[in-house]
Amino acid sequence: EVMPEDANPGLSKDSKENCLYFTLPMALNYQRNSYKLWEAAKATYEDVETTDVFDPKAVTQMSEGELKNRLVKYKVALQPNKHPEIWRKLCATLCDDFDGDIRNLFIKNDNSVEKIKEYIVGNKKKFPYLSGPKILNYWLYVMTQYTAIDLAGREYITVAPDTHVIQASMKLGLIKDEDKSRADIREYVSTLWEEVFYDTEYCPIDVHTPLWLWSRNGFAAQIEVDKDNELFQSGL
């Protein structure tokens, strides 16, 4: 099954450019079709007239109109004012604190998931939307899958509880129908999956892709859940 992030220009996995490619669009990955976002990101990167939006130093020198036009061209930015502002803020942070290279953020935090999350959340105004619990955890997961960055403490990457993951969790019986109305439903689902995999060889984020695809495909695949299995006792 093809994932949204598979739409990429095939850059060297350990390169600065590759790490930036999988970072900047992620901050705009909310309330939209992820496949279309990454298709737009790839088209933007491969167009010589727009590729410089992936260069933080170039972005900080662009006028508001220049950045907006580049991001809107292939619809990386769906909100023509807000989305370019988010993109510019992230680029400014990368330039001011990490010499325009997102890899330096990981180095500064010893490639530790726990430290990286603590740093970004502690400086959330510098990382608009990327610092949110859903996007932050999923971004870290994507970085482990599509870049050469080797993160320590992978178990601290929690399930990224978007609509599909929540629906799949309910389908499995991990949460009840009435739980959907909880104000903290995302945090609740994330915590339950942490409990399910506590002290096992698996990490919570390992179930994100299967759950996401299962829900997105309308639960076409039939899955039998052994509700006596100790892995599910904490959540049921």
Where are these regions (language model features)?
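HhH-family (HhH-GPD) DNA N-glycosylase catalytic core used in base-excision repair
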Residues: 1-236
